[in-house]
Amino acid sequence: MSLEIDAKAVSALLLGQGCANNLKTLLKNHETGSVSTEPLINSILDSFSFALSSQNIPRHVSQRSSKKKMCGIQGMEDSPTPAHIDGFIWRKYGQKTIKTSPHQRWYYRCAYAKDQNCDATKRVQKIQDNPPVYRNTYVGQHACEAPAYAVNNGGTYGSKMIKFDYVIPESVMPQPLSIDSQEITMEDKDTDDHILNYINEHLMEDEAYDVFPDVLGERCCFGLEPFPGLNINKS
């Protein structure tokens, strides 16, 4: 639009210059009596007036460019992968081919755009092949509450969530067992008595001697009964 206005202003000035040269020639040759000079004078004045007024015409600013100025770039970060962990959850909503790059540009918006009216967006563009480098350009500020975890959400790379400040509740933590030494001692004693009673009640005398020859023999050497209630007669 501004180039079009400048071209018209130049054309008007050139027209005025031509009229001024014609007027100069008439005055030089003293031909003003036979030819009217008023049209030339009016053309010169009109051309200068148009050229001066064209500079005061307001420039048209496109809505697209004004929107870009309002939503300024907040920052840029480079990463080796398109799934850059920056502490926010993003959702991909589009991609397109860029004239100045062989790689497509990916567009993301905050995952809380609808729930919390967050207008933050970002663009991901591959700027280098070997080694790969992806540039993340952030536009707008987050109006949502920043989550306590980071998210990978790079299109086909899937979505993986990592929560760094997660504390395991005490209810699911393994609890140490309380150990009562007296209780264990009583259980051991009860177990020993149970074994002895089992031997006295269910084993034959010969089998008991064959199974425990050393124990029975040792007790017999000291004049003790092998087991209370168990009579062993070896021939």
From Swiss-Prot:
UniProt record similarity statement: Belongs to the WRKY group III family.
Compartments it resides in: Nucleus
Alphabetical list of PANTHER family matching this protein: WRKY TRANSCRIPTION FACTOR 21-RELATED (PTHR31282)
Organism the protein comes from: Arabidopsis thaliana
Role: Transcription factor. Interacts specifically with the W box (5'-(T)TGAC[CT]-3'), a frequently occurring elicitor-responsive cis-acting element.
Any GO MF annotation of the entry: DNA-binding transcription factor activity
GO cellular component, one term: nucleus
Record key words, sorted: DNA-binding, Nucleus, Transcription, Transcription regulation
Protein name in UniProt: Probable WRKY transcription factor 66
DNA-binding region, residue intervals: 79-147
Alphabetized InterPro entries for the sequence: WRKY_dom, WRKY_dom_sf, WRKY_plant
